[in-house]
Amino acid sequence: MKRRIASIILAGAMMASLTACGSSGGAGQNAGGKTGDGAKANELTVWCWDPAFNIYAMEEAAKVYQKDHPDFKLNVVETPWADVQTKLTTAATSKNLDTLPDILLMLDNAYQKNVISYPDAFKDLTGNGVDFSKFPTAKTAYSVVDGKNYGVPFDNGAAIAAYRTDVLKEAGYTDADFTDITWSKYQSMGEDILAKTGKPLLSCTAGESDLIMIMLQSAGGSLFDKDGNPSMVGNDKLKKVIETYVSLVKSGVLVEVNDWDQYVGTMTNSTVAGTINGCWIMASIQTAEDQSGNWAITNIPKLEGVSDATNYSNNGGSSWAVTAGSKNPELAADFLSKTFAGSVPFYETILPKSGALATYLPAADSKVYGEPQAFFGGKPVYAQITEFASKVPSNNTGVYYYEARDAVATAITHVVSGADIDSEIKTAEDTVKFAMGK
């Protein structure tokens, strides 16, 4: 997940300073949450990161809310995700929840671990004015524990397949040929394109599991069962994913690189003819301004011979949590319900400058989301991606999600080098069980 947060903003916003702190009206920023009786009835404190993306969105949300609540004040404290996690853990384990802000931003894949581990640290938002039906089920599922909603969804991590249309044309293909296809069809066409142009279709960072998890979730697969227990051995979907990945590598259609910078470079330097990742990768693609008009977006390939296989998945994203330390939990819930969970104009405002693509489904019908994007062949890609998000299958992340991802990534590395798939899957599951103390 390296540099995922930095990569989510679009090209124009990527050049913005990442050092400034944001606040919207009223009180200045401070290093932590509220203290003692200092909280005011019309004031909220928020922890989040990235001035050009998350902080900017919060500032604009405050402006929207202030139209009907002119005395409302929002203090945004720029806090990197790693620090949010550390401070949250410290506050929860020390039972000192007053050190937390009213609202904090949490990575979707970290929700289950934090809410299950620290159930007293978060407010249940179910029945607090947020209409969760306005968001994709797969998105809200990240922050639902025991049937209760603990997060208001924000940014979109819907998976996309992006292709260099000029390279496809050189080999006799169009992006339409890559829409609603299977991975075997993808590999077959990829081998043909490689032979004709010398360019692989796909690249990824060796030793990371993002593509594996995208494939797995596209069929509703998980590394854990519904009770949070490791479910890798005997997991037909996982085995199919690994087999597919290894086949792509051995065919030359997928090329592995050493790090994130090299991965981005394969696209911007025209080494590969496409990529498959969360939609935030569009920001990195668009840094190659000379390629404008030569990219197209469509859905991802699906697995064959697997139940519930789809052409849709997810990678990344985050949601807003209201903490149990909030002195104004009703205000926090109302603020989120009127902005991130209730305002299409808000999302229309933040999209052009930050590239903050919503998971709020009504936004997909707005004129702004439907505007053609010259870089991507004049297609309305934002509306397209929002539609993709509505079709993503849910999966079980579990408390030990990141440990499981790492174990699977190690297994993949070994299998690509010739190790037995079943043995590596068992080793991965044993590794997670050990981490869980089982």
Say what each PLM segment does.
Residues 64-136, 170-172, 271-274, 288-289:
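Extracytoplasmic "Venus flytrap"/periplasmic binding protein-like
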Residues 187-192, 228-257, 300:
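Glycine-centered hinge/linker elements that transmit conformational signals in sensory
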Residues 1-45, 67, 423-426, 430-438:
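Short, low-complexity disordered leader/linker segments with a strong preference
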Residues 39-51, 72-77, 102-103, 150:
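Short, well-ordered beta-strand elements
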